[in-house]
Amino acid sequence: MPLDAFSRAVVTADASTSVVSDINALKAFVASGNRRLDAVNAIASNASCAVSDAIAGIVCENQGLIQAGGNLYPNRRFAACLRDTEIILRYVTYALLAGDSSVLDDRALNGLKETYSALGVPTTSTIRAVQILKAIAVAHIQGTNTEARAGAKYRKNETPLVEDRCASIAAEAAGYFDRVIAALS
């Protein structure tokens, strides 16, 4: 079962029959709380568009995916791809909020490559969709996504993240997407 930073500190201390000693790590986690919430909000507020843009991106790069015999044909396969991409994004946000990848690893990535292989889902297209999703999410966290880039789909964040404060959160989010890519490779 995935543990948040506090539960992990208590379990670790209990296992060594000592008091919680990693107070500095807990302080740092608490201090990053608002940044995490802002980052997750930036992703969640744009999730639907991010998912559809990631899938549209792989279709633009490979029109064969939506042709008869392609992996996004017929519509039920396309819908399943959108659903799976949304699930991946959702678990990345859970990991980002918790500051821990175990929920992502345990609930989304464990056996993902094998499942996709058994279903005949091309991992190269899936990896490319996750790469696009990563770029979109990081742009929203950093506030570098603009109306000019996103067009009518653009949703401005209510609370823009301060550039120097969001670099570590953006890097952490990118790392969770990289875990997804590694699990599919």
Swiss-Prot record:
GO BP terms: photosynthesis
Binding site for (2R,3E)-phycoerythrobilin 1: C49, C60
N4-methylasparagine PTM sites in chain numbering: N71
Name this polypeptide is given: C-phycoerythrin beta chain
Cellular component GO terms held in the UniProt record: phycobilisome; plasma membrane-derived thylakoid membrane
Entry PTM: Contains three covalently linked bilin chromophores.
InterPro entries hit by this protein: Globin-like_sf, Phycobilisome_asu/bsu, Phycobilisome_asu/bsu_sf
Entry binding sites for (2R,3E)-phycoerythrobilin 2: C81
Lineage of the species this protein comes from: Bacteria, Bacillati, Cyanobacteriota, Cyanophyceae, Pseudanabaenales
Assembly with partners or alone: Heterodimer of an alpha and a beta chain.
Organism of this sequence: Pseudanabaena tenuis (strain PCC 7409)
Transmembrane segments: none
